[in-house]
Amino acid sequence: MQQDEQKRLDADAKSQKAELENQKKQASELEESYNKLVEEYQKQIAQLEAEKRSAQVDMSSIRDFVISTSFSGTIESVSGFIQPVQGGSKSAGTWAYASGGLHLGLDWAAPVGTSVVAPASGVILYAAAPVGSNSGYLGNWTGYPAGGGNTIQMLCNVNGTLYAVSFFHLSQNIYVSAGQSVSQGQTIALSGNSGNSSGAHTHIEVYNLGSMSVSDAVARFSAGADFAWGTGWSGGSTCEAGSAAPCRERPEKFFS
């Protein structure tokens, strides 16, 4: 009798183990399938983003937010960048998402309302806040460039090299305007969740303009408001691959 009960218990344990292993296998297959779907979705979103941002912009629709060629100021050279987002942590690195899909900048996760400061002294090339601070979702193409939501791009000089630095997905609290000079560490905006965004963060891109003069850079941006500085939105022209300036820098090189 006792032996029969033990056999039954052993059989039940074996059956339960087999069922558990089967459930684990199914869960693993579902996770793998989900990850593939996420990767494909990220790739599609990145491709659509590149297409939308490559489209010719109607300058009359954004002229009020773009620096004028009448700017004749100088930019103080500083010895290095400082961290622009005053809190939070890195959530996605540059060139590609961990789950797949092109990603051309550094994502810094921080609560909506976190201070964003000028990483170096410079001048604001573009600043606009057309949408709500926490209005972002994937596939939301509001703002300029498309999907950027509330955005800023500034020009700065670090150790004699001219850089353009972009900030996307900001809140509506933007404290600067095009043509305004700013000092390193000055608060220029608050972080948000606007445009093509899955959560509160600031997307940062850095462009190395080499020995381009401030006046030439201002004139070039004023003419076409090209946030990508001729590098496009498909991932080419990176500085680390040896491309000549203007080229895309990996923001992690300066901000960590």
Region annotations inferred by a language model:
Residues 118-172, 178, 199-208:
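Zn2+-dependent peptidoglycan hydrolase active-site motif and core
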Residues 177-180, 205-256:
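Acidic, glycine-rich catalytic/binding loops that coordinate metals and/or anionic ligands
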Residues 130-132, 188-196:
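Short, charged beta-turn/beta-strand-edge "cap" motif at the junction between a beta-strand
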Residues 84, 99-100, 116-117, 144-146, ...:
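Extracellular/periplasmic catalytic domains that process cell-envelope and extracellular macromolecules
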Residues 74-123, 127:
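Domain-scale macromolecular recognition modules
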Residues 108, 122, 185, 203, ...:
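Terminal peptide-recognition signature
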Residues 1-77:
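Alpha-helical oligomerization segments with coiled-coil/rod-like character
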Residues 116, 122-124, 179-191:
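A structural signal for short beta-strand/turn segments enriched in small hydrophobics and glycine
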